[in-house]
């Protein structure tokens, strides 16, 4: 049995559960305030905790796997093994100041104050650029700190930029890009189960935005279809019993290319075209 730590709330909670479900690991929401929940896989349970606590819990072996943001992994400084970029929860950690501020670069903040929920990252950043600032740790509403006179600048997450605009803030610099990651305890002993989770999630990510296109095509035009359907390692070709003139061809195609591929395939004489969604794809 392994434990997967998942954010109990916030922007990573729902996407994490949906991704696990797509990977065949359906999660039962815990009753009341229960910390853990069973899954559809008898070898896996889920622990619901604060996203910021997950790196440490995985490092200490309380959970063997975890899903949390890269920003929180860096902030915690935890010794964990990063297995996958899960491609959701994308954002930037930025240094921002009020629009009317004279600050144009980090150096202009020398001797000033910076509010943030990421004191370790911010402190290291300013040390690296050789700027002396006072770091003020906050636990939320970072964007209002300059307006109420608490800080000259902030270091905060920015996904769409809307919050910065609403609070009349502008970006001075970008500290890092973040997204949700699958992390593991380096000393975890349940290697087979961990690898199963890894391959299932990777298969879902590989299948995102792709379809399987199948069709019967004239044998004499097979080379043209090879160019039309490159696939992952080239299209797969199968014989059709009792038909010497046609062969079956199928390949993985990007969703945005499907309409064009189908149209071109019809022009080349394809018949019986089928487009199927792909749940998982493991090379």
From Swiss-Prot:
Cross-referenced CDD domains: PBP2_HisGL4 (cd13594)
GO (cellular component) term, any one: cytoplasm
Needed co-factor(s): Mg(2+)
Pfam families reported in the protein's UniProt record: HisG (PF01634), HisG_C (PF08029)
EC number: 2.4.2.17
Subcellular location: Cytoplasm
InterPro entries: ATP-PRT_HisG_long, ATP_PRibTrfase_cat, ATP_PRibTrfase_CS, ATP_PRibTrfase_HisG, HisG_C, N-reg_PII-like_a/b, N-reg_PII/ATP_PRibTrfase_C
Keyword Nucleotide-binding assigned: yes
Metabolic or biological pathway, per its Swiss-Prot or TrEMBL entry: Amino-acid biosynthesis; L-histidine biosynthesis; L-histidine from 5-phospho-alpha-D-ribose 1-diphosphate: step 1/9
Keywords (A to Z) from UniProt: Amino-acid biosynthesis, ATP-binding, Cytoplasm, Glycosyltransferase, Histidine biosynthesis, Magnesium, Metal-binding, Nucleotide-binding, Transferase
Reaction(s) catalysed by this chain's protein: 1-(5-phospho-beta-D-ribosyl)-ATP + diphosphate = 5-phospho-alpha-D-ribose 1-diphosphate + ATP
Summary of activators and inhibitors of this protein: Feedback inhibited by histidine.
GO biological process, one term: L-histidine biosynthetic process
Catalytic EC class: transferase
PANTHER family in UniProt: ATP PHOSPHORIBOSYLTRANSFERASE, ATP PHOSPHORIBOSYLTRANSFERASE ATP-PRTASE
Family: Belongs to the ATP phosphoribosyltransferase family. Long subfamily.
The protein, known as: ATP phosphoribosyltransferase
Provenance organism: Methanopyrus kandleri (strain AV19 / DSM 6324 / JCM 9639 / NBRC 100938)
């Amino acid at each position: 049995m392994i434990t997967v730590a998942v954010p109990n709330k916030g922007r990573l909670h729902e996407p994490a559960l949906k991704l696990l479900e797509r990977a065949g690991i359906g999660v039962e929401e815990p009753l009341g305030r229960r910390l853990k929940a069973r899954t559809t896989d008898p070898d896996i349970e889920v622990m619901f905790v604060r996203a910021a606590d997950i790196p440490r819990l995985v490092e200490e072996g309380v959970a063997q796997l975890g899903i949390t943001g890269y920003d929180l992994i860096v902030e915690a400084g935890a010794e964990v093994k990063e297995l996958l970029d899960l491609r959701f929860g994308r954002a930037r950690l930025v240094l921002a100041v009020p629009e009317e501020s004279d600050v144009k670069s980090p150096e202009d903040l020398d001797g000033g104050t910076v509010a943030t929920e990421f004191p370790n990252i911010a402190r290291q950043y300013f040390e690296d650029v050789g700027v002396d600032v006072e770091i003020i740790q906050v636990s939320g509403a970072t964007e209002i700190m300059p307006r109420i006179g608490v800080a000259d600048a902030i270091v905060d997450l920015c996904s769409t930029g809307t919050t910065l605009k609403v609070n009349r803030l502008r970006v001075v610099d970008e500290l890092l890009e973040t997204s949700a990651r699958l992390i593991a305890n380096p000393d975890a002993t349940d290697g087979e189960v961990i690898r199963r989770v890894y391959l299932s999630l990777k298969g879902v990510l590989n299948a995102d935005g792709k379809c399987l296109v199948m069709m019967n095509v004239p044998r004499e035009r097979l080379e043209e279809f090879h160019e039309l359907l490159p696939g992952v390692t080239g299209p797969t070709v199968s014989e059709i019993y009792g038909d010497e003139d046609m062969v079956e061809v199928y390949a993985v195609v990007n969703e945005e290319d499907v309409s064009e591929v189908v149209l071109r395939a019809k022009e080349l004489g394809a018949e019986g075209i089928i487009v199927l969604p792909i749940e998982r794809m493991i090379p």
